[in-house]
């Protein structure tokens, strides 16, 4: 059985020691590349996004994340989403790879909302429509037989509000 490893440093995936391109790497050309324009901004946004994702996963697993004032608004937004939609997640931040196309990624959430199969990508910054559509399509390939009926970007804001944008499949 092949071994997929995810390395947070550099956001890299390897399959039996061979680096695989990620969904994010493949789709990044579809949006403004703020990473090259403002590297310091990219590092700050990436750290914040990782912290928010980790804290949201803790909430999904019934754990209480540490209170960090920098991300508390984002968590408040996620808690509001959970209360409003009461999702039943089947997958949470699970690194996966496609054995045929040899790419990897970590879909944020997939499961059920109101009896419908959904795939959700959590965002803490600007949502670039074309990039998110491509990213969700890549994640849909990775989750295989789940076949979501709806795909969403869930934008969490530091003000404590969320926006759920539906993307065509």
Language model: regions and residue ranges:
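Nucleic-acid nuclease catalytic cores
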Residues: 94-169
